[in-house]
Amino acid sequence: EPSLASDVVTCVTGAMVPQLEAFRDMLLAEGVSHWRLFSIFPMGRAKHDPTLRITDEQFRTLMEFIRRTRREGRIDASYACEGFLGGYEAEVRDHFYECAAGVTVASIRVDGAISGCTSIRANFHQGNIYRDRFWEVWEHRFKPFRDREWMRTGACADCRMFRYCQGGGMHLRDDDGSLLYCHYKRL
């Protein structure tokens, strides 16, 4: 329907990388005009199943594929809203990277937990709508989301790109706040 905005989301696995062009062509044949591609981060099932994740080389291949597809202009393809991508930033998505979780976006889970994003671990929840007023939580909590200096540890401690990525996506932090992996360094 013309008035309904939609897109196709694809979680790219290692097995999917060699099939990207054929998959794109199938989407085009079906009339799809917007396509978002995600890489799978190592949590949940993907933590213990390497077939769900892509290697660094496959990640670069994915970025090159998206860049090439965008230049062709037949489908509006873009990379997910996660991870700073250095020189690929303006080439694989329409906006410069930012993790908007808890900054301009909040999520309420089925159990009432208030978080910046449903992809973020429970220990980053900031309240619960069944016991807290949402506006109070929004106005007075979310400090770990809005002040990212606590992320300047490990791989981020001396990184010259920190001012751009601010420590990456909150969903890429494990339970103790350590970075699971850095998109920029994968490239």
Model region roles, listed by residue range:
Residues 119-187:
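Flexible mid-to-C-terminal extensions adjoining Fe-S/redox cofactors in radical SAM and related proteins
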Residues 1-115, 120-125:
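Radical SAM enzyme [4Fe-4S]-AdoMet core and its adjacent flexible, acidic
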